[in-house]
């Protein structure tokens, strides 16, 4: 980013908050191309000339696109021409895909500069443990025992393109860029309706930015109203406040009214509320009564329908009681389990029993989802019976064994915090037997004959690595006992979900 800040055009555009001139600068296309090569999934960038050609940047394609943008009439193709000239439609769709890639890069520039300036002069201590996914579960163990309800809200998608344009208008002040974005978005969808394919080249970065902008707008309003929820008692709203003047009206919040929002919001101040967004869902955990949870549900329905103009059904908001229902979160099924505890107390000559109930977070492995993921990747059938991995039989024995051991260790580490180890052992059994069947199929032998020839030492690789790690953590006496296999262990070095865990 520092490399391109030296250009005078970029500095002038940054000072005036103008992004539109950047669409006509070739170095921005180089930046987008370079980012496309460095993506994690290593997909082919659309700035390449073709799939078979060496990965070189095509300046000719960029020059043609810039010339077309200088004459925007050449970018407009009537529907009649799309039906008559298919080649023309494919070319236009290709150009609009290029613009979407470029727009995703350009529109993130002011956000990155604003974020970098906010961190200037500040020192932050890096804590790598907090980056781990497993660091969330100890927090849940401490906090969820005090909660009783979870509100699970499915975030709806905007049904009209103009909603996305209006949301982006609050964050990008350049009118020319917004008009150009609206024009390209409509033309792109027009061409896509005629020529889109199931496996066509899309730009996930661009659509992810639009989706995050849509969700960020929703969350900013929700968080503000959440902090001011004590002021919302018995207030009926009439006029929708403009988002552009949103921050200016904070001090005059009592005068703000909402259009077509006649509901009386009696939301109470609750300091024990926690919010998280996961897999397109908003999860709200709190210690409220059923009446207040229904009010929150009614609030979400009206917020989406009245403010975002999205038809939102109340069935998409589920109120789950943690003591009865399971919460699917980060590959686990979490719920609250009541453990009765009896304590015998004796005072002088009198003895009596004290019955206590201990609330504990119960984390369970979703076996149906894991078996479905294993069956999808051909490790077993839909019933969970192991089968051979035929596609791996061309590899060497050591390569096949290392693949299965790596998958087994990753799943074992991720689900080491499960309160029911029996399901984890079943997953290990499926992978081990699948490994043996794959090796037996490669050597054209039966499983029994293959194990009889090589012995049981073949499967020791599945246990060696995990045993070494646990022996360093726990004392030898505790490690030798069977209690180790009943405790939950959270690893603080897991930074991403495994593909089998992230089955959605």
From Swiss-Prot:
Its main location: plastid. It comes from the Eukaryota. One of its GO terms (biological process) is mRNA processing. Keywords: Chloroplast, mRNA processing, Plastid, RNA-binding, tRNA processing. Transmembrane segments: none annotated. It holds the Pfam family MatK_N. GO terms for molecular function: RNA binding. One of its GO terms (cellular component) is chloroplast. It is found in: Plastid, Chloroplast. Belongs to the intron maturase 2 family. MatK subfamily. PANTHER family: MATURASE K. Usually encoded in the trnK tRNA gene intron. Probably assists in splicing its own and other chloroplast group II introns. This is Maturase K. It comes from Nasturtium officinale. The lineage of its organism: Eukaryota, Viridiplantae, Streptophyta, Embryophyta, Tracheophyta.
């Amino acid at each position: 980013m520092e490399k391109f800040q030296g250009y005078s055009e970029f500095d002038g555009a940054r000072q005036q908050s103008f992004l539109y001139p950047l669409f006509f600068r070739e170095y921005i296309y180089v930046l987008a191309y370079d980012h496309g090569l460095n993506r994690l999934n290593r997909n082919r960038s659309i700035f390449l000339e073709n799939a078979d050609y060496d990965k070189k940047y095509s300046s000719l394609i960029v020059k043609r696109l810039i010339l077309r943008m200088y004459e925007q009439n050449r970018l407009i193709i009537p529907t009649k021409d799309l039906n008559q000239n298919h080649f023309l439609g494919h070319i236009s769709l290709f150009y609009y895909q290029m613009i979407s890639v470029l727009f995703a890069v350009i529109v993130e520039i002011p956000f990155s500069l604003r974020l970098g300036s906010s961190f200037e002069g500040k020192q932050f201590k890096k804590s790598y443990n907090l980056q781990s996914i497993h660091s969330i579960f100890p927090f849940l163990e401490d906090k969820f025992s005090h909660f009783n309800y979870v509100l699970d809200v499915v975030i709806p998608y905007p049904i009209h393109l103009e909603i996305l344009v209006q949301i982006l208008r609050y964050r990008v002040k350049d009118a020319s860029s917004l008009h150009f974005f609206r024009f390209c978005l409509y033309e792109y969808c027009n061409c896509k309706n005629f020529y889109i394919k199931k496996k066509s080249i899309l730009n996930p970065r661009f659509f992810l930015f639009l989706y995050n902008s849509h969700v960020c707008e929703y969350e900013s309003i929700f968080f503000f109203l959440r902090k001011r929820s004590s002021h919302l008692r018995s207030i009926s709203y009439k006029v929708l406040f403009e988002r552009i003047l949103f921050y200016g009206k904070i001090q005059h919040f009592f005068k703000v009214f909402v259009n077509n929002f006649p509901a009386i919001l009696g939301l109470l101040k609750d300091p024990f509320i926690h919010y998280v967004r996961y897999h397109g869902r908003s999860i709200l955990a709190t210690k409220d009564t059923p009446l207040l949870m229904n009010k929150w549900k009614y609030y979400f329905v009206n917020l989406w329908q009245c403010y975002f103009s999205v038809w939102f059904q109340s069935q998409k908001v589920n109120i789950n009681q943690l003591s009865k229902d399971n919460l699917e979160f980060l590959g686990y099924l979490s719920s609250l389990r009541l453990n009765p505890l009896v304590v015998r107390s004796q005072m002088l000559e009198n003895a009596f029993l004290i019955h206590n109930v201990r609330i504990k977070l119960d984390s369970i492995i979703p076996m149906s989802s894991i078996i479905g993921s294993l069956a999808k990747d051909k490790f077993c059938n839909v019933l969970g019976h192991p089968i051979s991995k035929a596609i791996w039989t061309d590899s060497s024995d050591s390569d096949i064994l290392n693949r299965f051991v790596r998958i087994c260790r990753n799943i074992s580490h991720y689900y080491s915090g499960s309160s029911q180890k029996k399901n984890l052992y079943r997953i290990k059994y499926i992978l081990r037997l699948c490994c043996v069947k794959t090796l037996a199929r490669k050597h054209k032998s039966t499983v029994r004959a293959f194990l009889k020839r090589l012995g049981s030492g073949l499967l020791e690789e599945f246990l060696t690595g995990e045993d070494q790690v646990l022996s360093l953590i726990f004392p030898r006496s505790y490690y030798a006992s069977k209690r180790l296999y009943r405790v939950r262990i959270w690893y603080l070095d897991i930074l991403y979900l495994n593909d089998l865990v992230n089955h959605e």
